[in-house]
């Protein structure tokens, strides 16, 4: 089978082919690659609307998505074993994150009630190792087998910036951070017994590799430290305008330039590489960018390009409630990016491998997923030409080599009538396969609409994808 996009002179389209009669040649991905992250003080518990939103993805994949409990406040939070409260803090404005807080055992009990895997972020910045060890032991006891990893410190490259964290009072650098990570990973890992089952998530920086990256950390780790490390993580917030985020070439370049070499270094160690915290724009997002349909398509494309690059899981950060423009739910009841994440989840669900069919340098993208036997499972076609209003252009994608005897293939369209700037909170809800997700509940609404795409006797079909749209094609 081949997937080719018709456009005269567009060299980026000419290599978008794969053999529909062979095995999948893409990267093996995590069964639940898309996860959610929440700043520690504001994590929601089971039974909330957030769990309904996550349950929609569980229904696609068969497993609860991974979550990370961490963020800026993890290096401001100390464990209080005597506290009966989930968390204790005060702020002058509910849109602020607290500068200090404590949390008790009930907070970790709550984390253990989630049905999927959990990454727990603990404090390193305050330099109170014994307190962090106590919290880690409680996390192991409460979360149990679902505790995927513990990370010690959030974005530690910023420890020497005002207000300077106690651990960095005498200076800070990649070398000093590496020495600190190694010391703490050994101490915490041995205290909780993870020398028999590695639990540490190393790295967790936001500044760019290689200065702050896994490759430079790995060369400073000995075998004992490496034995404690389960995963290596980095953060990423591309930022920019809606038009910039929507660009497929821009998204591909961002992932490739920042992470390709760092991912390769980690994979050589036989460990997973994680985007432990990411979203469109840092600091909670931008009101005129992060809730839009353009950001939804970026979310979809970004996930798939990351998985193609070898990144196992992508945790989309949900920050302070009331000041979270990029939240998939909560800030705007339903943010448009949830639709993009849902489309990416549907594309990857139950797949064994996936690959990109384009070189990432043009406006048009094609991805293929394969089942466990290597047979083609789905195609995702994306037209990143910018559309906001007026006449909407379209791009035909030609599919060749489809199985003989198929009269048609089914497809779901991800679209918004108002284009890149559409926002559900302004009455411009996107649709995925004709379906919307209800404000405040995430309950799917509307029929599940499949388009029928005719297949010729020669095994060829043409799918028209409008500007600022994507189409998911089902091959089985």
Describe every region a protein language model picked out.
Residues 463-475:
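Short Pro-Gly-centered flexible turn/kink motifs
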